[in-house]
Structure formats: C-alpha cells, structure tokens
Amino acid sequence: MSEEKKGKILNAGKRLFLRYGYKRVSMSDIAEAAGISRPALYLVFKNKEEIFKGAYKQWVDEKIFEIEEKAETLNTAEKKLRLAFELGVIQLIEAMKTSPELKELVERNFGYGSRKFENLVERFLTPIAPRKLKKSSWTAERAAHLLVSAVPGFKQTAETSEDLRSLINDCVSLILSSWPRD
C-alpha cells in the first residue's frame, strides 16, 4: 500500500467525518471522496473505525506539527506552553462547541491526542526543568502530566474561554515558579 493512497483515504475520511459525523459516513462515501473503488479501500483499511482512528491520528499529528513550528519562533518555555495550550486546547474546545462532529472525533479517540499533547508539553518543559533535584521531585514529565491532566477539570469549571485560558496560564505560571533556577 502506498503512503500516498493511505493519506488520500485518511484526508477524505477526515473531511467527511468532520462534515457529517461518524454515523452518517459510509465506506462507499469515503471511497468516492478518495477517488478509489470500494474494494480498493478495503485493501487498505478493514473498516470505517480504522479510518476514523487514522484520520484522528493524522489530524493530531498535523496540529502538533503546527504548534511546534510556531513555537520555534518563541524564546521562552512559558511562551511556548501558552501557545501550545491556546492552539491545542482552547481553540479546539471552542471549535468543538460549534461542531458536534469534531467533538465526536476528539472524544472517541481522546487518549492518543492527550498523550501526544502531553509529550509536546514535556518537550517544551525539558530544557528548563531543574536538573539538581531528587528523582522523586518535579520533572518535566511530571509537570507535563499535571498540566495536561488538569485541563478537563478546568474545562468543567470555566464559564468562558477566557476563564479557561486564565486557569491554564495560572497553572503554567505556578509550575514554572516552583522550579528553582539552576
């Protein structure tokens, strides 16, 4: 199977899932949108669920890449973290409010996106993490896990996107200020 064909199918699936939702999209719809026959589609993917998961993973990977590219222009971990949470959480939650299809895509595959985002946050924290602390103390990995794990609770209590942004920014500031400078 060529990666080009697989990408074409995943892009077609992603467009259709975001437009119509999982239940209203058939394998025939995906094959037609990808410009291939239905039997050819089944040679690449066993079922619609596999395409759905693949389309979500592709979307997450693209979003992570976008954040990484934009973060390259920023000079502090705090700015990179604020950017990551703005693009990877706040804008996503805003878009999910108006798109039940996007909400379905994210919620059905939340674990993958959460792990990828947590890894991104950890990469932004690693260069500034304290190196002289005991193993059981704050690490970039633990701080990233705390930040990402706190977001669902913040989402539940925040009344507006601005409230959510403020809670996330406060948590970022709290973690960064708790680390001694080398």
Q: Regions from the language model: what does each represent?
A:
Residues 99-104, 132-175, 182:
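Hydrophobic/aromatic-rich alpha-helical bundle segments in the mid-to-C-terminal region
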Residues 1-3, 182:
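N-terminal intrinsically disordered/low-complexity leader segments
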Residues 8, 12, 16, 20-50, ...:
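Helix-turn-helix
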Residues 79-115, 156:
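Amphipathic alpha-helical segments used for helix-helix packing
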